[in-house]
Amino acid sequence: MSRATVGRAGAGAGHGPSGGRSAAPTGDGGRRGGATGTDATPGARRIRAAFDAAAEEGRAALIPYLVAGYPDARTSLAVALAAADAGADLLEVGLPYSDPLADGATLQRASSAALRAGATLDRSVELIEAIAAARPGIPLVPMAYANQLIGGGDGRAAARRLADAGASGVIVADLTPDEGGPFEAAARDAGIAVVYLVAPTTAPARRAAIAARTGGFLYCVSLVGVTGARRSLPRAVGRYVAEVRAVSSVPVGVGFGVSRPEHVRVLRRAGADGVIVASALVDALGPDGRDVAALGRLVGLLRVATGA
């Protein structure tokens, strides 16, 4: 297993019922609304509402990913608004980082370019605030790494900053539930969800335990490895998604390698409640990262596929 999958897979799980599924076992003491987990926060409820609205329309939720500050601050805001207007149900906003261990070549390149263009944590939070102000109906879920948000502390300041900017939740790619208790407490106090991840290599019992701790939705990594556009998804992805759904009581969003409308259709038929598309959208922006219209067209095609 790659170190990227280790970081993301150990992180967390959860899955939301798309119409009356019974709650999954909580495992590991992860009581819903109790002393652990963040699924009872206002942010988690906003995330769940977006998944529920998509399910009521008979489709999966579409979650485009963008890199904050790529290729520059103004264009990344235009990218976010274009994705929202083309059919996004939620937006995942990657906070540029110098060592993005879960990211493949495309997202690493975009993150590096954003940093060279002046992206910082403060400016990324300002972007989230601008998106939230312009499109208040779309839940925003930043993705970051533990060193960015927590460092040597408990992350209270970062959680509050993200909440104040309008984020509904946060994905910390290399944070596991075993280590996430203090940051969960900070997120609960701030009112946002901590979204954890599972991978194909995560043991079934651990998937259930992670699912009990995630907030809003469970990030289901579709493959072993890092992010990046793929021609096809793993053959066993349908069975894997079904297995994760069976142990999760919050929505399951599937990402990594999801690149084409046909991938979205495969995952929807497998039972995914949402699909996350990242590298393919960055690629659509072209070599200079500025073809916002092309990105909007791809998001539109992906949105159609969520109900096919």
Regions of interest found by a model, annotated:
Residues 62-66, 91-93, 140-144, 170-172, ...:
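Hydrophobic faces of well-ordered beta-strands that scaffold small-molecule active sites
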Residues 74-82, 202-212, 254, 258-275:
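Catalytic cores of alpha/beta
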Residues 197, 207-242, 246, 284-289:
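Glycine/Thr-rich beta-alpha phosphate-binding loop at enzyme active sites
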Residues 116-119, 167-179, 193-202, 207-208, ...:
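Catalytic beta/alpha-barrel core
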Residues 104-140, 185-199, 233-252, 260, ...:
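Alpha-helix-loop-beta-strand connector modules within alpha/beta enzyme cores
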Residues 1-10, 15, 21, 25, ...:
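N-terminal amphipathic alpha-helix/helix-capping segment at the start of soluble metabolic enzymes
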Residues 89-100, 169-171, 176-179, 220-228, ...:
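Glycine-rich phosphate-binding active-site loops on the catalytic face of alpha/beta enzymes
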Residues 1-3, 27, 37, 242-253, ...:
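Alpha/beta catalytic cores of nucleotide-metabolism and tRNA/nucleoside-modifying enzymes
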